[in-house]
């Protein structure tokens, strides 16, 4: 218990606080009132914190001293004088400290010297500090008529057992009269927003079935800070002319009201619903009857969809966007037969079908050949192996494409071998005279020259030969030439034998 006041003074001047924590300050006053012996340690800690270089710690120490002087009586006044706190305050003002710290010290000295009766009062040390600064040319802030007296008048009526919320607000407001509400800066607004966020997280983490968690020291301190900031924000909004500062203050006020309402609901045991952002529906301003029309359209679409679904149960499902494909009138099937493209012959199996139609051929102007297309499918009654090993039958009924020599102009061919050989015996029979042995050499030269002319110019000595007929095959023509050549050779050999016998000498 010996260090409770000192520890409480340390917490009241903690640099992590964004402002004076009135709950801790009141707790410090209660400890000193219950045990006045602890006031010495508390004042010692406050003096040390007042000499800090951090202006925030200095202002927190001044608020704690003000609270003790208003609530703890003459013991604290004497300790402030004995610990030489008043000379320290005068030195701080002369060093030109932070404006908020300076204004707070001047306000406290003026209030204290007036409350203690000036130079002839009970504690002239307060007046001496005030007079020293005044003689140094330092101006003190003007006093307001609505300021609350430093000392509370003696009680004349009994204390009401149950205090109302308005009385509590009035008491807190009285303790804040020395503070300038319009001095709330942008940094303090941001610090207050941080306290709101911390309190919101802590309230959300509490178990709804155990409201005792609201009595935790940190939560109580944050709630008191939020209430204090709420009053300062309202004063700021009513007095400031800065639009940006006013907007920030209004936003902070909304957040403060929300978190305090959340705390009050939890304290009363009411279930707090989880706040979730609800989507705002888009509303057309120009049309008033859009909702009714949309409902009617929806009902019409629903009825029409039901009718279509009932009608579609007896019919096949089809895609209304794409029309059904047309039925194929001429299916193309692969023929199992084979075709010789060199000769144009078509080979088919021996088995014939009744429903097979001959392929239709079309002859274009350039006589191009097109593959046949069957009008009806060819039934495959046999297996592929049977179709491969069956004996092909030459189809003579089908019309074949014209031969190349029929589509082209007739050419002039040289005389065949048979024509040449046929001319030779005639020549020997008609042109070779019966000469004697003396004229054999000259006749042989003439015969050789004429045969040479005959072989070099066949068209002059032989009649033009017609091209082979279509029905004659090359093998037949070659065979005929060989036969003619053999006959010619036989006849020439038989005619030369008598001539040789006649040429023999007697």
Swiss-Prot record:
Topology versus the membrane: Peripheral membrane protein
Record bears the keyword Phosphoprotein: yes
Domain spans labelled VHS: 12-141
Identification of the protein by name: TOM1-like protein 3
Matches recorded under Pfam families: GAT, VHS
Summary of the tissues where the protein is detected: Preferentially expressed in cauline leaves.
Subcellular location: Membrane
SMART domains: VHS (SM00288)
Biased composition (Acidic residues): 288-298
Chief location category: membrane
Role played: Might contribute to the loading of the ESCRT machinery.
An annotated GO cellular component: membrane
Biased composition (Basic and acidic residues): 468-477
Gene Ontology biological process: protein transport to vacuole involved in ubiquitin-dependent protein catabolic process via the multivesicular body sorting pathway
Region of interest (Disordered), ranges: 266-328, 351-384, 398-477
Family, per entry: Belongs to the TOM1 family.
Modification Phosphoserine occurs at: 294, 383
Alphabetized UniProt keyword annotations: Membrane, Phosphoprotein, Protein transport, Transport
Cystine pairings recorded for this chain: none
Start and end residues of each GAT domain: 180-268
PROSITE patterns the UniProt entry points to: GAT (PS50909), VHS (PS50179)
Biased composition (Polar residues): 358-368, 450-460
Alphabetical list of CDD domains matching this protein: GAT_GGA-like_plant, VHS
